[in-house]
Amino acid sequence: MPSPTIDPAIRARLSQEALKGMSFLEHLEELRRRIIWTFVYIAAGFGVCWWWHEQIYDFMQRPIMKALAANHLDQKLVYLNPTEPFNMYLKMAFIAGLFVASPFVLYQVWLFIAPGLYKRERRYVLPFMFSTVLLFLGGGVFGYYMVYPNALTFLIGYSHQFSPMITISEYTDLFLTIILGLGIVFEMPILVFFLALMGIVSAGWMWRNLRYSILVIFVIAAIITPTTDIMNMCVFAAPMILLYILSIGVAFLVHPKNRRKRREAQEAQEG
């Protein structure tokens, strides 16, 4: 005999009632369970990346090797401390493990918060998680293939009268600063999404202040660009300007005033 189908609205209401019926200790127990699974996934991600740490390092050092080869220099990094290579591998495997584990960690976050959300709120969560990961990866890919190689080639070529002695720790820190920094910069639409959802900013306000925003973007690009040339600064600034324009569209879609107008128009059309 087939099991009866439960109406989604009833299921959501039952889930809300079950959540409200949970005691404080039960909430803590649920949180503890999700935290444990989060650490399990991070440890598993670290283990996988440690197993492949040499391949990951080869991928990470490719930009500097190309820059050194382009300037006819010895393609080898150095270290000044016996523990430096091992510590570098640990740091690299841990950060790469966080990337690998991030979808599973976000899923644990979803399992913890989902019972406390209404249906209209849940529809934002999964697109938010997907967009966050996608934008961060987009920033990292842009930095790895576009910004970082050009910056390294310029910097090493600019100081051709000196012999570089680049340590693996210094290179790793610079690599992570550029890649992670651009990944965070690419999260601009997510930040605007929440600000617009709370009514703090609007699409109209962002559009009216476009010229000032572009000026601020170029100032930020000048600060975070590792070189002093205008070309690399423009390479940094161009995607941020595009992300700002995309954020205007996001603000228009989610601002409470615009959502209320669309709902009223839909009700008037249906009526």
Swiss-Prot record:
Write out the transmembrane intervals: 35-55, 93-113, 124-144, 178-198, 213-233, 234-254
Question: What's a GO cellular component annotated to this UniProt protein?
Answer: TAT protein transport complex
| A Pfam family reported for this protein in Swiss-Prot or TrEMBL | TatC
For this UniProt record, give its keywords in alphabetical order, as a comma-separated list.
Cell inner membrane, Cell membrane, Membrane, Protein transport, Translocation, Transmembrane, Transmembrane helix, Transport
Keyword hit for Chaperone: no
Q: What PANTHER family does the entry give?
A: SEC-INDEPENDENT PROTEIN TRANSLOCASE PROTEIN TATC, SEC-INDEPENDENT PROTEIN TRANSLOCASE PROTEIN TATC, CHLOROPLASTIC-RELATED
Protein name, entry field: Sec-independent protein translocase protein TatC
Name of the coding gene: tatC
